[in-house]
Amino acid sequence: MSRKKKPLMSARGKPIRYKVHVKKGDTVQIIAGKDKGKVGEVLKVLPKVSKVIVKDVNIITKHVKPQQEGESGKIVTTEAPIHSSNVMLYSTKQKVASRICYTFTDDGRKVRMLKKTGEVID
């Protein structure tokens, strides 16, 4: 039986939320693991465990038992979470992965920028 791992708790009893450098909808490249080199879109960010779910990356197969009498079992494929340190933001224009930095625009907004290309993300 597999059990879900409980997130770390702070001194006040609240779960710790890690700062994750990617957001939902970002295009990322996998830099470590079995799917190294693949590029995909972030579907979900899990800040309590510092993981992200990327489209068509880290695919697992689950064998599901039949729920009702006449129903047959199924094999379901789904994306599993991958640690946020194993992904890097990807520029679709220049086809290169890069770290990010935070800069301010002329009107004073704080935005994320790719270090290699200088491309502003949001």
Swiss-Prot record:
GO biological process: translation
NCBIfam families: rplX_bact
Keyword rRNA-binding: yes
Keywords (A to Z) from UniProt: Ribonucleoprotein, Ribosomal protein, RNA-binding, rRNA-binding
SMART domains the UniProt entry points to: KOW (SM00739)
Organism: Trichodesmium erythraeum (strain IMS101)
Source species taxonomy: Bacteria, Bacillati, Cyanobacteriota, Cyanophyceae, Oscillatoriophycideae
Xref: CDD domains: KOW_RPL26
Similarity comment: family membership: Belongs to the universal ribosomal protein uL24 family.
InterPro entries according to UniProt: KOW, Rib_uL2_dom2, Ribosomal_uL24, Ribosomal_uL24_CS, Ribosomal_uL24_KOW, Translation_prot_SH3-like_sf
Protein name from the UniProt record: Large ribosomal subunit protein uL24
GO cellular component: ribonucleoprotein complex; ribosome
Function per UniProt: One of two assembly initiator proteins, it binds directly to the 5'-end of the 23S rRNA, where it nucleates assembly of the 50S subunit.
Pfam family of the protein (one): KOW
Record note on quaternary structure: Part of the 50S ribosomal subunit.
Gene3D superfamilies: 2.30.30.30
Single Gene Ontology MF annotation: rRNA binding
SUPFAM superfamilies: Translation proteins SH3-like domain (SSF50104)
